[in-house]
Amino acid sequence: MSKAFLDKFLNFIGFEEVEDSEKAPELSSSRETKTKNQNQSKSLLRSELTAVPAPRSTKIISTQPRTFTDVQTVAEHLKNGQPVVVNLSQVHPEEAQRILDYTSGVAFALDGSAKKINGEIFLFVPSGVDIVGAGDLRTFNENVEPLEEKVNSRWFKTETA
């Protein structure tokens, strides 16, 4: 009984005898608590961060259709969200007008836009792509010579004797 009394007295004063087996769980539990707190703070930081998608590489397709049937590939590229440059220099003017009308309709249906680049070269872009600069189809029609004159001067040149 005196030993129990002495242990209680020493414990009261602050001189308690602690075994190593008792200290080890306290240390490990404090380490576990710190680890848990760190993991919780990391998870809070991760939940606040949002992933920013990398800008996807946009390819610009360049085509030179020969006939009206070739325009289907231009429409497919526009549907897939790819800008298309169309060169109509090697096409008969009447066929070129049909291609231009069809491709403009596709671009309009997809909320895209069209711009004249130079001469008979046009840029068609899907929605979400902005074209900055002068010249579009409205100004193209104003600056172009009438189709009859173009057909006569380009394809049906008459020789004078």
Curated annotation (Swiss-Prot):
Keyword entries, A-Z: Cell cycle, Cell division, Cytoplasm, Septation
Region of interest (Disordered), ranges: 19-47
Gene3D superfamilies in alphabetical order: SepF-like protein
Pfam family, one: SepF
Chain intervals with Basic and acidic residues compositional bias: 21-35
Subcellular location: Cytoplasm
Cysteine-cysteine disulfides: none
A GO CC term attached to the entry: cytoplasm
A single BP term in Gene Ontology: FtsZ-dependent cytokinesis
Primary location recorded for the protein, binned into one broad class: cytoplasm
Complex and partners: Homodimer. Interacts with FtsZ.
Summary of the function given for this chain in its UniProt record: Cell division protein that is part of the divisome complex and is recruited early to the Z-ring. Probably stimulates Z-ring formation, perhaps through the cross-linking of FtsZ protofilaments. Its function overlaps with FtsA.
Family to which this protein belongs: Belongs to the SepF family.
Protein's UniProt name: Cell division protein SepF 2
Organism: Desulforamulus reducens (strain ATCC BAA-1160 / DSM 100696 / MI-1) (Desulfotomaculum reducens)
